[in-house]
Amino acid sequence: MKSLPLVFGLILCASLYQLSHAQESPDPSQEDYAYLTRMHVPEPVIRCVAAFDRWVALTPKYDTFIVPDRRVLGAKIDNDTTIFSPVNPIPVDEVIAMRAFAKVRGGSQWTRVDSRCGVRDGRVAGVSLSPNVRPKIVR
């Protein structure tokens, strides 16, 4: 009976030790895009890719979004544009455009899309995807 408090004390010490030395898991949202930083991709482009991933998950049309590495590295950053688009006149500091691929929800077909992202004060202000259809060759 006298050893019962000793046993509980040891169990409490062991659990507190494990709790205090538990490793913190890294933020998955940052870890997913860490490779882009190592590839020397500009920070606004990385923010746009992350915004597209979040946005596509919520849209009813697409369920998956992929930007190939060479398209991310070749993203066009337009600093001269002051509005996101004529249809959506959000004031922005820069517009980032890159070609990507999106998969239609419920289907297996990947579609080429032109992605545009507006950045204002270092934050993503607007995103848009438009299908990029190859012109048909008429002979």
Which residues fall in each region the model found?
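Positively charged n-region of N-terminal signal peptides that target proteins for export
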Residues: M1-P5
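Mitochondrial intermembrane space
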Residues: S20-R139
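Bacterial N-terminal signal peptides
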Residues: V7-S15
